[in-house]
Amino acid sequence: MKALLLPFFVLTSCSDPKPPVAEIPNYQTLHHEGLNGTFFHFDHEGDLYLACSIHQGGHAKGTTLNRHDSKDTASVGKQIHHQKDLRILTFTSDSIGQADALPYSPDPDVRKDDEVAILNRGEIIRGTVVRLPEGNDHHYYLQTSKTFPANGMSGSPVFSKRLGTVVGVLQTANSKTAANLGGFELLEMP
């Protein structure tokens, strides 16, 4: 009896969700000249999307975004989801994809005292969640030990160290030039 050897392949689908990561990543955000805000891309169940704050503008279909410190670009597609001050959009790009997308898990469980970080233009601004949404205020608040220039940072991703995923979108801060308190909206994909 002859043994038949068959090759065995393990294939990973492009639609596999990106798993959480152990360390807060260094991430280069996306920007559009003339807009005072930030976009980022993330993986949700194997599909890639852009997130931004509604109040910053620049989310018209066909708008070209540039990755900070790079020639990489993305073209804004259609809106697929929105929340109070948060928009989720499709996009196309030849150079921005799965490899550097931020991981996301549905229904993020953000808690008081969680270590989080604002990711913007390759910088990691570390903070701690100090307040959860109350009453009509839908924001979670993070406090940093060092001040940061918040002007133009609306739309930046807020990343949870404990969960290893992006959990929210920065929308407000207590100062444009020397903030130490930032408010973010939880990213809740349908």
Language-model regions, residue ranges each:
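Sec-dependent signal peptide recognition
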Residues: 1-7
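C-terminal motif of bacterial Sec signal peptides marking the signal peptidase cleavage site
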Residues: 11-13
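Catalytic histidine site
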Residues: 17-72, 163, 169-175, 179-180
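Short amphipathic beta-strand and strand-loop transition segments with alternating hydrophobic
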Residues: 40-41, 76-80, 129-133
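Conserved active-site neighborhood of the chymotrypsin/trypsin-like protease fold
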Residues: 46-126
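Flexible, gly/ser-rich surface segments that form the specificity/activation loops bordering the active-site cleft
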Residues: 96-154, 169-179
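Pro/Ala/Gly-rich low-complexity, hydrophilic intrinsically disordered segments
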Residues: 180, 187-190
